[in-house]
């Protein structure tokens, strides 16, 4: 079953909604996630997915989308290198799926991010490890976050005082990243909720 990049995005959104809420998204919710102007565009992609057997359509229901059982077991998407400026869950970033279920972590994980570099080594997050990430912007001082500063995505410990945010490495060789929210753009992609060691993947 070969899907276009956009169809894969729609399928990932459906899986995420089912994992998080227990039911699939509406057409309007899919359209909003992907920036479509109307639910009709989402409907077209859903029909294409149904033709390819990736989903089943249930007529007459706003959430009438069903995932075949085999499709529900793909697990969490593994996000590799994130291209500057593009959404972290964009299809081109997904390099694999891991069969761990989201509920293995608390709060539940939405995806696994492959860690680059050794800036968090002192708390055991090493280059090549997978960081389980819960998608949220509601984070607190001291938590490990995935943050986008400008066009770069980084994993750091979060600290905020007023309009100043510090993204702090757990490695004395790396200086904190200081962000003045009055002048710079900062977006929190999610909260780190667990680590899968690179060595555990083999």
From Swiss-Prot:
Keyword list, A-Z: Autocatalytic cleavage, DNA damage, DNA repair, DNA replication, DNA-binding, Hydrolase, Repressor, SOS response, Transcription, Transcription regulation
Entries under Pfam families matching the protein: LexA_DNA_bind (PF01726), Peptidase_S24 (PF00717)
Single GO biological process annotation from the record: proteolysis
Highest taxon, organism lineage: Bacteria
Catalytic site: 119, 156
GO molecular-function terms, A-Z: DNA binding; serine-type endopeptidase activity
Keyword DNA repair: yes
Record's catalysed reaction(s): Hydrolysis of Ala-|-Gly bond in repressor LexA
Site (Cleavage): 84-85
Purpose of the protein: Represses a number of genes involved in the response to DNA damage (SOS response), including recA and lexA. In the presence of single-stranded DNA, RecA interacts with LexA causing an autocatalytic cleavage which disrupts the DNA-binding part of LexA, leading to derepression of the SOS regulon and eventually DNA repair.
Oligomeric and partner information: Homodimer.
Family: Belongs to the peptidase S24 family.
Protein's recorded name: LexA repressor
Record gene name: lexA
């Amino acid at each position: 079953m070969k899907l276009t990049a956009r169809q894969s995005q729609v399928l990932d959104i459906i899986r995420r909604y089912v994992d998080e809420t227990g039911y699939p998204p509406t057409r309007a919710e899919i359209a909003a996630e992907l920036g479509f102007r109307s639910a009709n565009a989402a409907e077209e992609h859903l029909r294409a997915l149904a033709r390819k057997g990736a989903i089943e359509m249930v007529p007459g229901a706003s959430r009438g989308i069903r995932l075949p059982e085999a499709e529900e077991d793909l697990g969490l998407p593994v996000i590799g290198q994130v291209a500057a400026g593009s959404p972290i869950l964009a299809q081109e970033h997904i390099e694999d799926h891991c069969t761990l279920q989201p509920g293995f972590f608390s709060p539940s994980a939405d995806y696994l991010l492959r860690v680059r570099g050794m800036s968090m080594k002192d708390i055991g997050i090493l280059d090549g490890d997978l960081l389980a990430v819960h998608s949220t912007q509601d984070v607190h001082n001291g938590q490990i976050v995935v943050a986008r500063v400008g066009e770069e995505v980084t994993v750091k410990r979060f600290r905020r005082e007023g309009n100043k945010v510090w993204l702090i490495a757990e490695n004395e060789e790396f200086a904190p990243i200081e962000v003045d929210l009055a002048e710079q753009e900062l977006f929190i992609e999610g909260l780190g909720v667990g680590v899968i060691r690179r060595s555990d993947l083999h």
